[in-house]
UniProtKB/Swiss-Prot annotation:
Residues 309-362 are annotated as: Necessary for intracellular retention in Golgi apparatus lumen. Ubiquitous. Isoform 5 is expressed in pancreas. Residues 1-36 form the signal peptide. Belongs to the CREC family. GO terms for biological process: calcium-ion regulated exocytosis; cerebellum development; fat cell differentiation; maintenance of synapse structure; response to ethanol; UV protection; zymogen granule exocytosis. It comes from Homo sapiens (Human). Glycans are attached at N40. This is 45 kDa calcium-binding protein. Residues 98-133, 137-172, 197-232, 233-268, 278-313, 314-349 form the EF-hand domain. Ca(2+) 1 binds at D111, N113, D115, K117, E122.
Length: 362
């Protein structure tokens, strides 16, 4: 009796003998095909370009500032001024007990007189301290970014030097851009990039302190990236926001103008809820915090005062607002149980078993 696999081997024997040769040939063909195809470096180049662009472009979001550059409310503001440098330390994936302990350590630092309650004055002092941390962080980042756009290291950056680096981050050849600028030739850029360049140039000129020389020092470059560090640049940022929101051209803002929905239509109930929250939150912010004289109109001066992160009066108002959110027993102070219960407001993460954990951490 011949086993089936023996019979099969005898029938396919000649072909089986060719198998190693065929495999070798197939491998050679695949290798040639792989080597003939150009390597895909586009994603790598894109990541590098994005990193370079992020290093030299003014950020849309400024930690510790109430409004974004586009006039939207800073949704993370309360967490930023409560956590400071610990902003990234309360991830959803973090171990809950460790997060609760960390939150109670912060509570103890805010509670200067150790009476296990946080007053508005204590919270005000803490907000100012955390805002200063964000300022220091921005200064350190700006120093690094300044070196990236100051290739000759002379301590000054011209608009043309910055323009070369910016367009290089957009994928243009640095040498070709530099040559075109030197020869006063027209640069071919798309409409969107041209618009960004024009806005950046306006901002560059504003950051150039008198006497204007169109060269930015390291300090002026900091103001260019972070307008909250300069009174003049903060005023310029406010002017830009008012210009974007002001619908009747009177250079001030009414409630309807400030709460106007962003461009876009509501397509579903979730979108409607988001838009309803947008209106409610902005109306409350306008009436309770920005419109200081409560006349229904916000001037550029009122908006500038509201956005100034180092304004102690604003810090006190924010402290009172933050306490009011969690002050369940209405004693105008924050207690450990309240901070833990409203941990999502203070840290962005919801910490469970807050009442029991008070005894654990203390």
């Amino acid at each position: 009796m011949v086993w089936p696999w023996v019979a099969m081997a005898s029938r396919w024997g000649p072909l089986i003998g060719l198998a190693p040769c065929c495999l070798w040939l197939l491998g050679a063909v695949l290798l040639m095909d792989a080597s003939a195809r150009p390597a895909n470096h586009s994603s790598t180049r894109e990541r590098v370009a994005n990193r370079e662009e992020n290093e030299i472009l003014p950020p849309d979001h400024l930690n510790g500032v109430k409004l974004e550059m586009d006039g939207h409310l800073n949704r993370g503001f309360h967490q930023e001024v409560f956590l400071g440098k610990d902003l990234g330390g309360f991830d959803e994936d973090a171990e809950p007990r460790r997060s609760r302990r960390k939150l109670m350590v912060i509570f103890s630092k805010v509670d200067v007189n150790t009476d296990r309650k946080i007053s508005a004055k204590e919270m005000q002092r803490w907000i100012m301290e955390k805002t200063a941390e964000h300022f220091q962080e921005a200064m350190e980042e700006s120093k690094t970014h300044f070196r990236a756009v100051d290739p000759d290291g002379d301590g000054h950056v011209s608009w043309d030097e910055y323009k070369v680096k910016f367009l290089a981050s957009k994928g243009h050849s640095e040498k070709e851009v530099a040559d075109a600028i030197r020869l006063n030739e027209e640069l071919k850029v798309d409409e969107e990039t041209q618009e960004v360049l024009e806005n950046l140039k306006d901002r560059w000129y504003q950051a150039d302190s008198p006497p204007a020389d169109l060269l930015l020092t390291e300090e002026e470059f900091l103001s260019f990236l972070h307008p909250e560090h300069s009174r003049g640049m903060l005023r310029f940022m406010v002017k830009e926001i008012v210009r974007d929101l002001d619908q009747d051209g009177d250079k001030q803002l009414s409630v309807p103008e400030f709460i106007s929905l962003p461009v876009g239509t509501v397509e579903n109930q979730q979108g409607q809820d988001i838009d309803d929250n947008w209106v409610k939150d902005r109306k409350k912010e306008f009436e309770e915090l920005i419109d200081s004289n409560h006349d229904g109109i916000v001037t550029a001066e009122e908006l500038e005062s509201y956005m100034d992160p180092m304004n102690e009066y604003n810090a006190l108002n924010e402290a009172k607002q933050m306490i009011a959110v969690a002050d369940e027993n209405q004693n105008h102070h924050l207690e450990p149980e309240e901070v833990l219960k409203y941990s999502e407001f203070f840290t962005g993460s919801k910490l469970v078993d807050y009442a029991r954990s008070v005894h654990e951490e203390f």
